[in-house]
Amino acid sequence: MRNSLYKKNIISISDLNQNELELVLKKSAFLKVKAQPNLLKNKIIASCFFEASTRTRLSFETAVHRLGASIIGFSDGSNISLGKKGETLSDTISVISSYVDAIIIRHPQEGSARLAAQFSNGVPIFNAGDGANQHPTQTLLDLFTIKETQNKLNNLNIAMVGDLKYGRTVHSLTQALAKYKNNQFFFVSPDSLTMPNYINDMLYKKEIHWKRYKNIEEIISEIDILYMTRVQKERLDSTEYASAKSKFVLQTSTLKNARNNLKILHPLPRIDEIDNNVDFTPYAWYFKQAANGIYARQAILSLVLIEKHFE
C-alpha cells in the first residue's frame, strides 16, 4: 500500500481518507506485535504541550522513545517565551521547526494546530488536541481498539455519552467512523452539551442514521460500542458544570441488557461518569484502549516520517 501519509500534517481526522486510516491501523497492529526500536533513529521530535496532559503526552513520548527517536519540548506553556514574554505561536513554531523533524502540539485554542502547520516550514505537525476542536491521534487509537474488539469498523451501533459539545474526541471519532458503511450513532447528552451542528450536518449529508437520547438505559441493548466522556469542568462555567456532571453515570446495573460484544471506551481521565465496579465487567475496555495509544502513535509517527516501510 502506497504511503500517502509521508510528510503529511496530522491536524484533523477529516484530512485522512479511508485508505490512510487503514494504513495506520495495519501499521499499529504490526507494531503491537513487533518492536521497531531503530525505525526513527537520529530523528528529533518536539513535544509542545501548551495545555495540561497526562496520557496523550506520555503516550506520544513513549512512542517516540520506542521508535528510537529523541524528544525535546515542554509540558507547561506558561514557562516559555510565548507564555512569559508574549511571543506569538507562529514565531514559536517557526523557531522550533528549525530544530526538529516533527512537532507534536497541544494548545487550548481551536485551530492552533492548523496555524502551526502554516509556520512550521514543512516540518510535519501532529495535533495532540486543539481546544474543543480535534484530537486525531486519539481517534486513531479509538479506531484501532474498536477494530480489535469488533473485527470491523462498519455495520456498528455506536453510542457517545456525556459532553458531546466540547469533547473533541467524539467529534473526531464520529467523523472517522462516518467514512465506513452502515454505522449508526446514538448521542446521549444533556441539552446544553449536544453534538455540534457541523457534525450533525455531516451525518445528514452522508445519510448516516443518528438520534439523540436522554439516557443510556434506553439504548444499551442495541449498541456495540459505548463511548463515555467526562463533563469537562475546564470548558464550562460552574453552574453548567454542576448541572451536567452527575446526570450520565454508568453503573453495572445499566449493563444487564448489554450485548455480549459490547465494549465500553473512554478517552480518560475518568471522574465519576463510570462507576469503579464497571471496571470488573467484561465490557470495560478503556484501560486497554489507553495502552493502544502507544501503538497508534508509533504508527502515525513512523508513517509520516519514513516514506518506505517493509514488514
From Swiss-Prot:
InterPro entries: Asp/Orn_carbamoyltranf_P-bd, Asp/Orn_carbamoylTrfase, Asp/Orn_carbamoylTrfase_sf, Asp_carbamoyltransf, Asp_carbamoyltransf_Asp/Orn-bd
Pathway: Pyrimidine metabolism; UMP biosynthesis via de novo pathway; (S)-dihydroorotate from bicarbonate: step 2/3
GO terms (BP aspect): 'de novo' pyrimidine nucleobase biosynthetic process; 'de novo' UMP biosynthetic process; amino acid metabolic process
GO molecular function annotations of the record: amino acid binding; aspartate carbamoyltransferase activity
Known catalytic reactions: carbamoyl phosphate + L-aspartate = N-carbamoyl-L-aspartate + phosphate + H(+)
The organism's place on the tree of life at top rank: Bacteria
EC nos: 2.1.3.2
Keyword Transferase: yes
Keyword flag Transferase: yes
UniProt-annotated binding residues for L-aspartate: 85, 168, 230
Gene3D superfamilies assigned to the protein according to its UniProt record, in alphabetical order: Aspartate/ornithine carbamoyltransferase
Enzyme kind, highest EC tier: transferase
One Gene Ontology cellular component annotation held by this UniProt entry: cytosol
Pfam families hit by this protein: OTCace (PF00185), OTCace_N (PF02729)
Keywords: Pyrimidine biosynthesis, Transferase
NCBIfam families given in the database record: asp_carb_tr, PRK00856.1
Function of the molecule: Catalyzes the condensation of carbamoyl phosphate and aspartate to form carbamoyl aspartate and inorganic phosphate, the committed step in the de novo pyrimidine nucleotide biosynthesis pathway.
Quaternary data: Heterododecamer (2C3:3R2) of six catalytic PyrB chains organized as two trimers (C3), and six regulatory PyrI chains organized as three dimers (R2).
Family: Belongs to the aspartate/ornithine carbamoyltransferase superfamily. ATCase family.
Protein name per UniProt: Aspartate carbamoyltransferase catalytic subunit
Organism: Buchnera aphidicola subsp. Schizaphis graminum (strain Sg)
Lineage of origin: Bacteria, Pseudomonadati, Pseudomonadota, Gammaproteobacteria, Enterobacterales
